[in-house]
Amino acid sequence: MSEINFDPVNLTQSLVKCASVTPKDEGALTVVANHLNAIGCDCHPLTFSGNNSYEVKNLFATIGNEGKHFAYAGHTDVVPVGNESSWKYPPFSARIDAGKLYGRGSEDMKS
């Protein structure tokens, strides 16, 4: 496995900027795949039927073929924004103010 240096704040900002409101992906899985590919993962996009009414994009990634198996499940989608005027900053701006990152998903699986 390769080592890679990356900025976790930059990664979080990249993900928050993706307006991935369920069931839309809006590029979030591409951001994840690019980072996983950089450390040697093989990434495979998958599409499932969500409740037979919409498609749900997923990403299956593997690295190596020896040792014990480890599985990690996460998500990059967020619930709808609601009243955008209630937000201090636009919900997908990934704005940093006074050392805090603001945006949809910044305190969930996007961080």
Name each region found by the language model.
Residues 2-107:
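Acidic/His- and Gly-rich active-site-bordering loop/insert found
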Residues 109-111:
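Short, intrinsically disordered, charge-balanced linker/junction segments flanking boundaries
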